[in-house]
Every structure is written in structure tokens, then in C-alpha cells.
Amino acid sequence: MLPDIGGTELLIIAAVALIVVGPKDLPALLRKVGQFVGRMRGMASEFRASFDEMARQSELDELRREVQAMRSGQFTNPVQDAADAARDVQVDQVFADIDASLSSGAMQAHPYAAGETHNSILPTAEPSAEIVEAKPKRAPRKKAVAEPVAAEPVLVEPVKAPRKRASQKQEITVEAPKAVRAPRKRASKAGDSTASDIVS
């Protein structure tokens, strides 16, 4: 709450207030201090709210002026200004030249592409083929066939039955619960009285 006041300072202030005011009037004083702090916070929030309202009002006034300027035609749209600048005569001339060259059918090759096709100064290398002998493939391995040994006994596992499907009906049996005795009561401690101890 108060970053400049630590725990020891608060204890000292509380001790001084207890000595000066006394234990009898201290609760009333703390109540009045709490009310004063509440009023100060209320005034601060009211000031903040009025300040925010003035800021909103100034923004609304500015927006109203812009809307009035747009209605009267004085407001210039930045997108429209850029479009008007692009309609320059030189830009139109460049586009007209491009359209004329495309429609005439006379196409010029790219200067670098033309140099590659008509370059007779550089010697051309004749393609040469090297003969490489192919390695023979390995023969596939033969699978080893196990010979049955008659002397050793062979363990044969029984074949499991296939699982039943969920769609088949299964009989469900429900057993009745067995009766369970209640736990015995503990013996009472010495000095405790129970209903059986009282004799009328």
C-alpha cells in the first residue's frame, strides 16, 4: 500500500498512536482516518473520471471536424492523391508504348539471351561417353531348410479359440450382495457414561 513505509515503521507509528491517543479513543480515531482515506480515494477517482471525460470529448470534437471537412469536400483522401499522381502523362505514355510493341508482334530477344545463341567465339565441347563395365549381380541366397529331427521331442502349444465379438449376446449374471455385520462398538473409557451405565 505504502511503498516508503516498512513493517518496523508501521509498528512505531502504531505504538506512538497508542500512547498519544490512548487505547480508549484509538478505534474511533482509526475509523475517522479510514473515512478520510475513503473520501480522498473517491475524490481522486472522480478527478480521473472527469479527466477521461474531457479527453473523450476532445477526441469527439476532432472527429466531428473531420466529418464536417469530408462532407464539405475539403478533406483530401491520401489514397485518392496517390491515384491522381499515378495518372501522370509520362506513365500513360510508357503503358501505350508497351501495348504498341505487344500488339505489333515484333519481339526482341533479351540481349543476354541473344549473345548466348550467336556466340561462335567460344569453342564447343563435343560430348564424350565413357564406357563403364557393369558389375555382375550377386546370386540370391538360398533359404536354409530345416531337417526334422526325430530324436528330440517337439513342444506343441494348443491353438487358442478366436475371440468373441461384441455383437454376440453374452449372458450377464448378477449375484446378490452378501450380508455384512456392522462393526462392534468400542468399549467406553473410564469416566464416560453411556445409556447402559445409567440405572433408574
UniProtKB/Swiss-Prot annotation:
MF terms (GO), sorted A to Z? protein transmembrane transporter activity
Give the span(s) annotated as Disordered: 160-200
Per the record, the domain of life is Bacteria
An example Gene Ontology biological process:
protein transport by the Tat complex
Return the GO cellular component terms, semicolon-separated: TAT protein transport complex
Chain ranges passing through the membrane:
2-22
Positions with biased composition (Polar residues) = 191-200
Q: What topology does the record note for this protein and the membrane?
A: Single-pass membrane protein
| UniProt keywords, alphabetically | Cell inner membrane, Cell membrane, Membrane, Protein transport, Translocation, Transmembrane, Transmembrane helix, Transport
> Does this UniProt record's set of keywords contain Cell membrane?
yes
Oligomeric state and interaction partners are given as: The Tat system comprises two distinct complexes: a TatABC complex, containing multiple copies of TatA, TatB and TatC subunits, and a separate TatA complex, containing only TatA subunits. Substrates initially bind to the TatABC complex, which probably triggers association of the separate TatA complex to form the active translocon.
What name is this protein filed under? Answer: Sec-independent protein translocase protein TatB
Source species of the chain? Caulobacter vibrioides (strain NA1000 / CB15N)
Lineage from the top down? Bacteria, Pseudomonadati, Pseudomonadota, Alphaproteobacteria, Caulobacterales
